[in-house]
Amino acid sequence: MCGIMRVYRVYNAYKIVGAVIFSMSIIVILYISIILHSLKLSFSIILAVDILIIALFAYIFLKPKKLVVLDNGIKVDNEFYSWDEVIEFFVSLNSIQINLKGKREETFNWETPGLFKYRPQIEYVVKKDAELLKILREKIENKERKRG
C-alpha cells in the first residue's frame, strides 16, 4: 500500500545554547590568530583561517533542529519515529517535551521574550503553536503526561 505521507507542520527549533557557545568562538579565533601571527604568516592567511573557524562554529552550534509532524509519526532532524515509538509527551508553560523510544527526551522550548535570561540551560527554541498540541493530542492522546 503506497500512500502519500502528509506533512502537518515543520518547525525549526533554534539552538539557544549554541549561540552562547558560538560567541566563545571569538576567543578561539583570537588565540589562533596570535599563534599564526607569531609564526609570521601573512594577514590574508590569518583572516582566511579565522573565517573558516567562524563558519565551522556557526554550522556546528547554530544549526537548527527540525521537528516535522507527519500523519504517521514525527521526524526530529533526519530521524523518523512512528507514533508507536513516542513514549509520552509533556506540555509545560514554557516547553513541550517528547520522550522517544531508544533516545533521550527531546525538549523544545517555546519562544518567550526574556526566557533565556531566566533559564540558561535551554537548548532548542520553537515558536509556540496550538496546532502542534492539537495534532499531538489527536495522534497520541493517551500518552500525554498530565500534571499532578
UniProtKB/Swiss-Prot annotation:
Keywords for this protein: Cell membrane, Membrane, Transmembrane, Transmembrane helix
Keyword field contains Transmembrane: yes
Topological type in the membrane: Multi-pass membrane protein
GO annotation, cellular component aspect: plasma membrane
Domain of life: Archaea
Localization per record: Cell membrane
Transmembrane regions: 16-36, 41-61
Chief site of localization: membrane
Family indicated by similarity: To M.jannaschii MJ0696.
Protein name in the entry: Uncharacterized protein MJ0275.1
